[in-house]
Amino acid sequence: MPAIISDQFRILNAETFVQSFTGIGTTANYYTFLGHPNPANVTIPNYGDADWPQEPKDSFEQEYGYHDSMMFMKRITSEDIARVVPRYDWQSGSTYDMYKHNYDNVNTAPQLSSSTLYEAKYVVINSEYKVYLCINNGQDPENPRGKKSVVEPNFVSTIPQAASVIAQDGYIWKYLYTISPADVIKFATEKYIPLPKKWGDANTETVKNASQTGKIETVSITNRGINYTLKEGSTVRLPILGDGTGGEVTITIANNEVSTATVTAGG
């Protein structure tokens, strides 16, 4: 029978690992160490030498060798560890994925052909180390993969919005948090950025408290339809059908088809 280790299980494992650094008594301590290089030994297969590093093995014999070669070590504390996510610096002219709950191996995220949400290119960091989530990338029938982003997001409002009032790229961003200078120096790399140590702390409390589970923030048009007989430029308010209540979207008709669709009540 097929089996899967879900992303949520991986996240739980990462969280459990991070929490283990707080220690239980004096038994849960982690260390990083540096050992002296082992001399070449051509009589042992895969032993390695200066030009061919030894292959790591998961065995007690290998562990004994690590201990024998240790020169010094440093204890790793809870202040030395952070959860991270892939780093995507915002760049003008780049296209980003939008948040969707249904990415899978059939319906992949278009930018990287990712089969899961967490592998998609939908979280960006701007030039001031503010982190945003893309909830709309301008996707429409003419641009099914999304549009190029041309205006850098730089707001800290808790309300999802365009990067500016003049932005015409169709992007809607949600501000998440700002990485502190200390965390940038300690944890940020070319490939990864750190997450907040705890959602809802002093740095993220406002964002967390403003979030609403199950609220619809944006919609996209997949088919504009044809032969609508409403007056040119007419707007129509329609209920959103789903497993929630109170959702409403306003559509605009132009050239006998749906021109725009905007959420007027998120439910």
Please name every model-derived segment.
Residues 166-267:
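Conserved, function-critical positions that sit in or immediately flank catalytic
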Residues 1-211:
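Tryptophan-rich substrate-binding surfaces of secreted polymer-degrading and adhesive proteins
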